[in-house]
From Swiss-Prot:
Its main location: endoplasmic reticulum. This is ER lumen protein-retaining receptor. It comes from Plasmodium falciparum (isolate 3D7). PANTHER family: ER LUMEN PROTEIN RETAINING RECEPTOR (PTHR10585). Pfam families: ER_lumen_recept. Belongs to the ERD2 family.
Length: 221
């Protein structure tokens, strides 16, 4: 494991910690998309199905279990934990993932998986789904327009986690004994990173001018 992968994993954990602390301290989930969290739970469950039959390393196993449990706990806080759950607005967090994201990702997984077995299909599906899982969150923030400081830091940290994973892939391609090639993962990671760029742009402007982060609203989704 190289430094870029380690930093990426740390940033991913930090983003989860930021979100959970925001929920528990503020006692509300305004501006947080539970639909995005649910998509990530699907991503982790599909990708880490190998937990049941493959042991890579202690670190790998611990991280996989941590990601699954943490995202499940986050969903619990938003959906069920009072008083946080009382602030969840289902009418606003209404991106139709089951219509616009899951079916296309499933089709792509069938077209791009290496072999037609359950593990490879689920792994490919998880890559494509993660590449667009941020969309419900971005759409929700666009509707809300004014973004809380801690929420913006959560989204930025998520974007940085993915950016370091791309650096990890580049490093492995040039420095592994056998060049690391993962076309599906590369394309998925690139799509995911591109989706963050617009948010990064407005975040940088807000910081530069010392103003609150306010996103433009382009209509209903």
């Amino acid at each position: 494991m190289n430094i870029f992968r380690l930093i990426g994993d740390i940033l991913h954990l930090v983003s989860m910690y930021i979100l959970i602390m925001k929920l528990k301290k503020s006692k509300n989930c305004i501006g947080i998309s539970c639909r995005m969290q649910e998509l990530y739970l699907i991503v982790f469950l599909c990708r880490y199905i190998d937990l049941f039959f493959v042991f890579v390393s202690f670190y790998n196993t611990v991280m996989k279990i941590t990601f699954i449990l943490t995202i499940a706990y986050t969903i619990y806080l938003i959906r069920l934990k009072l008083p946080i759950s009382q602030t969840y607005n289902r009418k606003v967090d209404n991106f139709k993932s089951e219509k616009y994201l899951i079916p296309p990702c499933l089709v792509l997984s069938l077209l791009t998986c290496k072999t037609y077995n359950l593990y490879n299909i689920l792994w490919s599906f998880s890559i494509w789904l993660e590449s667009v899982a941020i969309l419900p969150q971005l759409v929700l923030l666009e509707k809300q327009r004014e973004v809380e400081n801690i929420t913006s830091h959560y989204v930025i940290t998520m974007g940085l986690y993915r950016a370091f994973y791309i650096l990890n892939w580049i490093y492995r391609y040039f420095f592994d004994d056998k060049p690391y090639i993962n076309v599906v993962g590369w394309i998925g990671g690139l799509i995911q990173t591109l989706l963050y760029i617009d948010f990064f742009y407005y975040f940088a402007l807000a910081k530069w001018y010392g103003k609150k982060l306010v996103l433009p609203f382009n209509g209903e989704v």
